[in-house]
Amino acid sequence: MGTVRSRRLWWPLPLLLLLLLGPAGARAQEDDDGDYEELVLALRSEEDGLAEALQHGATATFHRCAKDPWRLPGTYVVVLKEETQRLQPERTARRLQAQAARRGYLIKLLHVFHDLLPGFLVKMSRDLLELALRLPHVDYIEEDSYVFAQSIPWNLERITPARYRADEYQPPNGGSLVEVYLLDTSIQSGHREIEGRVMVTDFESVPEEDGTRFHRQASKCDSHGTHLAGVVSGRDAGVAKGASLRSLRVLNCQGKGTVSSTLIGLEFIRKNQLVQPVGPLVVLLPLAGGYSRVLNAACQRLARAGVVLVAAAGNFRDDACLYSPASAPEVITVGATNAQDQPVTLGTLGTNFGRCVDLFAPGEDIIGASSDCSTCFVSQSGTSQAAAHVAGIAAMMLSAEPELTLAELRQRLIHFSAKDVINEAWFPEDQRVLTPNLVAALPPSTHGAGWQLFCRTVWSAHSGPTRMATAMARCAPDEELLSCSSFSRSGKRRGERIEAQGGKLVCRAHNAFGGEGVYAIARCCLLPQANCSVHTAPPAGTGMGTRVHCHQQGHVLTGCSSHWEVEDLGTHKPPVLRPRVQPDQCMGHSGASTHASCCHAPGLECKVKEHGLPAPQEQVTVACEEGWTLTGCSALPGTSHVLGAYAVDDTCVVRSRDVGTTGNISEEAVTAVAICCRSWHLAQASQELQ
């Protein structure tokens, strides 16, 4: 698709009626590329037209890319509400065309979505946006925008666990039970690396190239796609050497595509899945554009249908949350590292980072198939290559355990990653705590990991600076929220709590007056057959503090949190020389409400670990022993200079203000409290399967 704008045409009524009643108005016309299009100029009655539309308030919203050079004004994705019927997108599109015709505009209907999301793609004048937003059933409209390829043999050694490394790469399986869809440029399927492993589909939806009116031949435009196909499943340089690939062309010869083309490609995959259900599917999205609500929504729909999506974080040395599909929570988002496990730098740019990145993977000077000849190889760099590595690892994990859910796969990828190997100084200071220090690696064995209690840390977006501002973090649908904490760089916060929203528990953090904003931090775990609840004690007002415990029989404590309404709890000095938290009890400041997260699950046992220091420290940590998993992390209790607490792998970290910058030296204790759990039931079930 190009960026051709619709033109406003004033039609004399007799001529308009002639067009409608004649053959030219009754049949579709062919556009310049030979595609079949329909120009509807039908007049409809006032009762069924604008008058009806204007009765409805414009409750729909309009979205567009935040980066102006990437925008495609004149092309729009109109998304309808989820409860609309299957035929409603066509009806709404034709209603819009009819109402536009009465105003002298032509609208070109480019595509109708059914299987991915209810909606349609149109080319029209921006003048018609208000009219379209007022149509019944419309949820939101998004202006189309560009997406870009993200590429500018140490890599195979790097993803092999250290104690299993040999002179050559020996993966546990080839990923042969998994099909990988690659949305990219075209592919040279005859290259010896991927010959017989790639099926080039007939799907092609790409924009015109800059500076030319005509597309180049696809065979001359397959460098990026061929290289990535080789990284995923190449005979010599591939990660999952047995995985089969299907290629969809959504990027042109310049490595440029559009959001709408990507949407149509994802719908193509969903249609194939419905028509011919197969084994596990992995979709590799080695592209990035500006934040797109509709693209993220499409990824969510596909993920909930059982498809694993792996995306490049982006090569803009920026927060990955500003780009799509990297910002979609249901997507496994991958940043890039080099042979020294450091973030990849690409000229003045480099890998994206931040809370939307799940993990990093090799992405610099990656050797792979070249489109120059059927036996040529080439080196490429970028988060596209990093994402291809993770797609290959995912294929092998799914081949070993085809029933893995997306949540289970993501947790395993995180658990088996190499930890704390990246130099965080490369990232902006405000992003270091948010960016995972994880580099992807194959598990020692693709079997037998089921006994582990897997947990991960999920950070919210930063809240606003107002006193009543809040931040919210949530877990994936298949995960349990076992604890909630908060963090503020200024230290001005009012704590956190777990609350129910839409049938799921969420973690909500509260900013304080004069604060710069706050983060909510959820600890999300895989705990089958769990029954979890939250017990709250109001502020005690006096005494040593507010206490609450798990009073239901068989429930164990998995997390503690507190929140308060006052701006400053003041100082509170709990004793340091004796244990302060019982195995089933939380303690908070006497002026705070305290919450205990309590769970019952077969074989679940938990214990509390503490580490306290009598003088202010910038950081205090306490870790769980091997075989135990951190489910809760909190600071004890309510010290005025504590910035917050958060989990890093199985370590609880409590951060405090630098006393050198505050000018005040306090003798308040800083205590980190970790709740460590394990499940005997999971271990027993895993042994029975082996």
Curated annotation (Swiss-Prot):
Site feature: Cleavage: 150-151, 216-217
Residues bearing the modification Sulfotyrosine: 36
InterPro entries reported for this sequence: PCSK9_C1 (IPR041254), PCSK9_C2 (IPR041052), PCSK9_C3 (IPR041051), PCSK9_ProteinaseK-like (IPR034193), Peptidase_S8/S53_dom (IPR000209), Peptidase_S8/S53_dom_sf (IPR036852), Peptidase_S8_subtilisin-like (IPR050131), Peptidase_S8_subtilisin-rel (IPR015500)
Primary subcellular site in the record, as a coarse category: cytoplasm
Keyword Calcium (UniProt): yes
EC category: hydrolase
All residue ranges annotated as the Inhibitor I9 domain in the record: 75-147
Keyword annotations: Apoptosis, Autocatalytic cleavage, Calcium, Cholesterol metabolism, Cytoplasm, Disulfide bond, Endoplasmic reticulum, Endosome, Glycoprotein, Golgi apparatus, Hydrolase, Lipid metabolism, Lysosome, Phosphoprotein, Protease, Secreted, Serine protease, Signal, Steroid metabolism, Sterol metabolism, Sulfation, Zymogen
Cofactor(s) recorded in Swiss-Prot or TrEMBL: Ca(2+)
Annotated region (C-terminal domain), positions in chain: 448-690
Single GO cellular component term: Golgi apparatus
Post-translational note: Cleavage by furin and PCSK5 generates a truncated inactive protein that is unable to induce LDLR degradation.
Known regulation of activity: Its proteolytic activity is autoinhibited by the non-covalent binding of the propeptide to the catalytic domain. Inhibited by EGTA.
EC number: 3.4.21.-
Keyword Plastid (UniProt): no
Signal peptide limits: 1-28
SS bond partners: 221-253, 321-356, 455-525, 475-524, 484-507, 532-599, 550-598, 560-586, 606-677, 624-676, 633-652
Gene Ontology molecular-function annotations: apolipoprotein binding; low-density lipoprotein particle binding; serine-type endopeptidase activity; very-low-density lipoprotein particle binding
Active site: 184 (charge relay system), 224 (charge relay system), 384 (charge relay system)
Stated family: Belongs to the peptidase S8 family.
Alphabetized PANTHER family for the sequence: PEPTIDASE S8, PROPROTEIN CONVERTASE SUBTILISIN_KEXIN TYPE 9
Assembly, per entry: Monomer. Can self-associate to form dimers and higher multimers which may have increased LDLR degrading activity. The precursor protein but not the mature protein may form multimers. Interacts with APOB, VLDLR, LRP8/APOER2 and BACE1. The full-length immature form (pro-PCSK9) interacts with SCNN1A, SCNN1B and SCNN1G. The pro-PCSK9 form (via C-terminal domain) interacts with LDLR. Interacts (via the C-terminal domain) with ANXA2 (via repeat Annexin 1); the interaction inhibits the degradation of LDLR.
Domain notes: The C-terminal domain (CRD) is essential for the LDLR-binding and degrading activities.
Name of the protein in question: Proprotein convertase subtilisin/kexin type 9
Organism: Lagothrix lagotricha
